Curated annotation (Swiss-Prot):
GO terms for cellular component: chloroplast. Oligomer of probably six alpha and six beta subunits. Keywords: ATP-binding, Chaperone, Chloroplast, Nucleotide-binding, Plastid. PROSITE patterns: CHAPERONINS_CPN60 (PS00296). This protein binds RuBisCO small and large subunits and is implicated in the assembly of the enzyme oligomer. It is found in: Plastid, Chloroplast. GO terms for molecular function: ATP binding; ATP-dependent protein folding chaperone. It comes from Ricinus communis (Castor bean). Pfam families: Cpn60_TCP1. This is RuBisCO large subunit-binding protein subunit alpha. It comes from the Eukaryota.
Length: 495
């Protein structure tokens, strides 16, 4: 047990150093150049202890950090510090003869009660300032990142997706990509309309959406004739266009008779159908599905969609369309949100979130720039944290930061467990009550102040008041912009 405990301590100490505005950075000496990191889960994942028992202890904290990171994407340091305290106090009690199962039950009951309390106390995010505050705190008090994330969310809305990429310059910028991007480019480079940029651009194009292969030109001749009469370009999205059909399209395109381009359907298997359906709804097309017996040769112009602007490069296609029916689009987004709520797989939930964003018309790309590779890594991690924290806050509201929410929750513990008769369960509740003040105490210690004094002072104040380590004052943290997403605090507790 001692070895387990010492492993837990070693890891939690390294992670705990980064907590709070005055937290230090940790330098990880991995292969290649050392990395400077200020982010719990990365540190936890990087540390392996030589002693197998100690490493088993460290693995417990690593697990806690990873779980919190998966569910809330931030708050990993807080969760690790909590876990360490609970384990430390728990081992003490068990050593002195308490029943570990009852203690665990006591802790679980209390956590349940505290989470209900947290939900009551959390207040929804109001406007841009809150978003900026949450993002800044999470990125390690970086106002710049806070402003950026607030900008990005202004542009794409709460359903949008923020993706984070490395930029080749020193600047960090936010770009908003309108419309829906498909990761498939033109089937043949002959379709290019702008030879300088090697892209194909259409305006007000008709769109054919199908999951069939098009090989015979006679299947699409009626459509080609109609769209040529309408003087509208035609974009074909099909499983593949090959053989005679492709050859004919290319020849006629080069002679300037037809204005047409073809791309392969994105995704594969079940996901391909779903994505094609999304495109169809966005452009107002009828999805010509082979399993419904809708053949391409019978397609009429009315069944084609319309895209206001189409840009096709060699490996991606962007469609900007004004959805024909807003209701259908909203219904589709709602359906995807339900699926997102029900799925367990991380891969699926990422893909679903991406589809929701593409349909609701917003993908903001934050291009992260920095002077060195090391700085870039650190900045990307911080922005990633800030992004996750912001979406968590939009989802479940905010609570005062700086560990204050947990300190205030610790004062509610006796009320939750008033009627518990079992001594060991009560012990569990006490352990949790003592552990809850650890994050606030550590934030103060990292700022060079006596932790216990801070905790006692915070306990005596109202819910929103806490210790601000940046200004070294006790103040209303919500007004001072020191706020955490309730979801992050909740996940830290649960794990």
């Amino acid at each position: 047990r001692t070895a387990l405990q010492s492993g837990i301590d070693k890891l939690a100490d390294a992670v705990g150093l980064t907590l709070g505005p005055r937290g230090r950075n940790v330098v990880l000496d991995e292969f290649g150049s050392p990395k400077v990191v200020n982010e719990g889960v990365t540190i936890a994942r990087a540390i392996e202890l030589p002693d197998p028992m100690e490493n088993a202890g460290a693995a417990l904290i690593r697990e806690v950090a990873s779980k919190t990171n998966d569910s809330a994407g931030d708050g990993t340091t807080t969760a690790s510090v909590l876990a360490r305290e609970i384990i430390k106090l728990g081992l003490l009690s068990v050593t002195s003869g308490a029943n570990p199962v009852s203690i665990k039950r006591g802790i679980d009951k209390t956590v349940q009660g505290l989470i209900e309390e947290l939900e009551k106390k959390a207040r929804p995010v109001k406007g841009r300032d809150d978003i900026k505050a949450v993002a800044s705190i999470s990125a390690g008090n970086d106002e710049l990142i806070g402003t950026m994330i607030a900008d990005a969310i202004d542009k794409v809305g709460p359903d949008g997706v923020l993706s984070i990429e490395s930029s080749s310059s020193f600047e960090t910028t936010v770009e908003v990509e309108e419309g829906m991007e498909i990761d498939r480019g033109y089937i043949s480079p002959q379709f290019v309309t702008n030879p300088e940029k090697l892209i194909c651009e259409f305006e007000n194009a008709r769109v054919l959406v199908t999951d069939q292969k098009i090989t015979a030109i006679k299947d699409i001749i009626p459509l080609l004739e109609k769209t040529t009469q309408l003087r509208a370009p035609l974009l074909i999205i099909a499983e593949d266009v090959t053989g005679e059909a492709l050859a004919t399209l290319v020849v006629n395109k080069m002679r300037g008779i037809l204005n047409v381009a073809a791309i392969k359907a994105p995704g594969f298997g079940e996901r391909r159908k779903a994505l094609l359906q999304d495109i169809a709804i966005l452009t107002g097309a009828e999805f010509q599905a082979s399993d419904l017996g809708l053949l391409v040769e019978n397609t009429s112009v009315e069944q084609l969609g319309i895209a206001r602007k189409v840009t096709i490069t060699k490996d991606s296609t962007t469609l900007i369309a004004d959805a024909a029916s807003k209701d259908e689009l909203q219904a589709r987004i709602a359906q995807l949100k339900r699926e997102l709520a029900e799925t367990d797989s991380v891969y699926d939930s990422e893909k679903l979130a991406e589809r929701i964003a593409k349909l609701s018309g917003g993908v903001a790309v934050i291009k992260v720039g920095a002077a060195t590779e090391t700085e870039l890594e650190d900045r990307k991690l911080r922005i990633e944290d800030a992004k996750n924290a912001t979406f968590a806050a939009i989802e479940e509201g905010i609570v005062p930061g700086g560990g204050a929410a947990l300190v205030h929750l610790s004062t509610v513990v006796p009320a939750i467990n008033g009627e518990d008769k079992d001594a060991d369960e009560r012990l569990g509740a006490d352990i949790l009550q003592k552990a809850l003040v650890a994050p606030a105490s550590l934030i103060a210690q990292n700022a060079g102040i006596e932790g216990e004094v801070v905790v006692e002072k915070v306990k005596a104040r109202e819910w929103e008041i806490g210790y601000n380590a940046m200004t070294d004052k006790y103040e209303n943290l919500v007004e001072a912009g020191v706020i955490d997403p309730a979801k992050v605090t909740r996940c830290a507790l649960q794990n």
